[in-house]
């Protein structure tokens, strides 16, 4: 694992400097990446470095009145037997990319990936939540999802406003019975 030598305030300050230097006039996704480089390849013990990549993300599809079309992907979500899915590392997103490209090639807007047990996991780069009979339901961390600050915030806000929430395994058949399905993520 990599331990950050940077404090949260140092990272925040660096992000602000990068944003000011680039003068964006649209929504921006900020990728903060920690890495180790140098001789020794995988076993390198050189200092941890950081780079910040601001990526313009214009929101042309913000009008969601008619909804979006999702599909159950043929790509299984990675699991702890191969790579820890809870880790926010670049390599873990390749699995989601394949699922997304498959969905796009079949004229769907997004994939829904299942875990090793055939239970609902997540979409590509987004956690999945559903409303069913007034209850907000989302798969647990053990369903091969990326642990998400946004997902946790939505669960906390739902509880704060006295909405019933359930974090539990979700069968794919339940998606067809849901009142609403939505994706959540930071970018």
Regions found by a protein language model. Name each.
Residues 1-17, 21, 35, 41-187:
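Helix-start/capping segments and mature chain N-termini
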Residues 24-34:
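Ordered, amphipathic secondary-structure segments that act as subunit-interaction surfaces
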């Amino acid at each position: 694992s990599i331990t950050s030598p940077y404090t949260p305030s140092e990272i925040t300050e660096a992000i602000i400097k990068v944003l000011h230097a680039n003068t964006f006039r649209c929504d921006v996704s900020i990728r903060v990446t920690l890495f180790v480089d140098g001789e020794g390849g995988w076993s390198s013990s050189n200092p941890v470095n950081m780079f910040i990549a601001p990526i313009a993300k214009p929101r042309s599809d913000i009008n969601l009145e008619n909804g979006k079309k999702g599909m159950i992907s043929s790509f299984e979500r990675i699991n702890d037997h191969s790579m820890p899915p809870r880790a926010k590392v670049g390599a873990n997103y390749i699995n989601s990319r394949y699922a997304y490209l498959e969905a796009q090639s079949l004229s769907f807007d997004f994939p829904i990936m299942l875990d090793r047990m055939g239970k609902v996991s997540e979409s590509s780069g987004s956690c999945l939540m559903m409303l069913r009979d007034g209850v907000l339901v989302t798969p647990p961390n053990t369903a091969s999802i990326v642990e998400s600050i946004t997902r946790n915030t939505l669960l906390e806000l739902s509880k704060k406003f006295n909405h019933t929430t359930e974090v539990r395994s979700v069968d794919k058949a339940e998606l067809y019975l849901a009142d609403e399905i939505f994706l959540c993520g930071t970018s």
